[in-house]
Amino acid sequence: MYQKEIEQRRTFGIISHPDAGKTTLTEKLLLFGGAIQLAGTVKARKATRHATSDWMAIEKERGISVTTSVMKFHYRDFEINLLDTPGHQDFSEDTYRVLTAVDSAVMVIDGAKGVEPQTEKLMEICLLRNTPVITFINKLDREVLSPLELLADIEKKLQIECVPMSWPIGMGKSFRGVYNLYRRELQLFTPGASTRGGEVFVIRDLDDPELDRRLGSQADELREDIALMEGAANPFVYEHFLKANQTPVFFGSAINNFGVRELLDAVVELAPSPRPRLATTREVLPSEEQFSGFAFKIQANMDSAHRDRIAFVRICSGKFTRGMKVRHNRIGKDVTLANATIFMAQDRASVEEAYPGDIIGIHNHGTIRIGDTFTEGEELRFTGIPNFAPEHFCRVRLKNPLKTKQLQKGLNQLSEEGIVQVFRPLTSNDYILGVVGVLQFDVTMVRLLNEYGVEADYESVDYAAARWVTCPEREKLENFEKQHRSNLALDSEGNLIYLALSQWRLSNTMEEWPDITMHKTMEHSQRLN
């Protein structure tokens, strides 16, 4: 029974460049999975509904996903956990952390633009982690690049072999649907965002006159394309897909429901069930009986009526049951998980039991941090959940000095969520904020004002790069601190970080101090020295 529950789980994230149609696709997957009845039109600012997965106020205002939503739904005989990731170009750090909690990913490509910069960045992470990727080429209802151009672009830029699983019939105004190369099925859809399905015709033989009747002159084009594909395309090898060496490719139009159902079918048929996870001491198998999991995200104020905080925990092994006692390893305390929840964007429901691959929400009263591990007693720490060295910096100046406590509390919570990193220089009482993408400053500003009543000025500072600093020899580290005190700060964990005024200065310092190690990333909640 327990093994069956594991095999029925599919936990995946959706990654893309901004505006490739990721949020629309997320909604349509939920629609086809029966989780929602009506898809919200994401870009329609005047519409009364907002996209289900973009629920925070700043997201509704700007039409971008800046936090991560977790949505659970049932499809066929499978339990799907879909993680919608920030789509804005500035949110790769938060997106990266989400990719530590998934077993596979769906990559959305805008058919008119091909591979774009954020897609490359996120695919690098998937390839590093050997995360299997299914590709969905979107917006075929518009004028797009040719299918062969798109496949060549993916292979060249992302260094991954493409295997088309479906083939588009026309594009733009002449787009008629998709032909499933593996099922030998022709799928013709009626355009329209409210359509949940479409006509499907089984065409076992491409010479079938039914094809000509349905497609007219496009039937011969389809025959030529498929003959070309079958001669040149690589065969699909499941082991290559699992190692992220090969990606199955589907074509469609999310806004018009073209190709969405077969993409969802591919997720349940091809994407792996929960996989083993690496901890500091050993590999943890999902089939192990003892419960284990890690927090990959902290979200404050999911319910505007209550100042609550939720830790998103990915279950790695064992079975979760409501009211169970677990060990919070970092602080060495046993805690009772009495009110865990599952998510559907902002909607929540109590959960009685959950299995590996599931994402549960645990109420957090300030004790849980990103990267924390929970077990049934074993001393474990799951690895691979890093902080990135920030690339943009600013100084916070309070308009009202009496709000210092609120500022400290707000920054503390936002840094634990991974929204912003907070540094305290060794030579002043300033608060220096560091982010990977500048939009995070806007999010920090809006949330400090709305949630903590903090009005502040945000001044740019001259730092160009940051690196965490370690050295096994105490004396050398102390000498380094003396000479570079004005460029050193402490992060929220008390780790020493070097703030460089330029890339040249950073390189120069690294050359002058070969015994000092400069780290571009570090594990969450880790004390370095």
Curated annotation (Swiss-Prot):
Citing just one GO molecular function, the answer is: translation release factor activity, codon nonspecific
The leader peptide range reads none
Q: Which Pfam families match?
A: EF-G_D2 (PF22042), GTP_EFTU (PF00009), RF3_C (PF16658)
Q: Keywords of this protein's UniProt record, alphabetized?
A: Cytoplasm, GTP-binding, Nucleotide-binding, Protein biosynthesis
The Gene Ontology biological process terms listed for this entry are: regulation of translational termination
Q: Which residues bind GTP?
A: 16-23, 84-88, 138-141
Predominant subcellular localization, coarse grouping: cytoplasm
The organism's superkingdom is given as Bacteria
Record domain tr-type G: where: 7-275
Q: Where in the cell is it found?
A: Cytoplasm
GO cellular component, alphabetical, reads: cytosol
Q: Which purpose does this protein serve, as stated in its record? A: Increases the formation of ribosomal termination complexes and stimulates activities of RF-1 and RF-2. It binds guanine nucleotides and has strong preference for UGA stop codons. It may interact directly with the ribosome. The stimulation of RF-1 and RF-2 is significantly reduced by GTP and GDP, but not by GMP.
NCBIfam families from the UniProt entry: prfC, PRK00741.1, small_GTP
Q: Which family does it belong to?
A: Belongs to the TRAFAC class translation factor GTPase superfamily. Classic translation factor GTPase family. PrfC subfamily.
PANTHER family the record matches: PEPTIDE CHAIN RELEASE FACTOR RF3
Q: What is this protein called?
A: Peptide chain release factor 3
Task: State the organism of origin.
Answer: Syntrophus aciditrophicus (strain SB)
Annotated gene: prfC
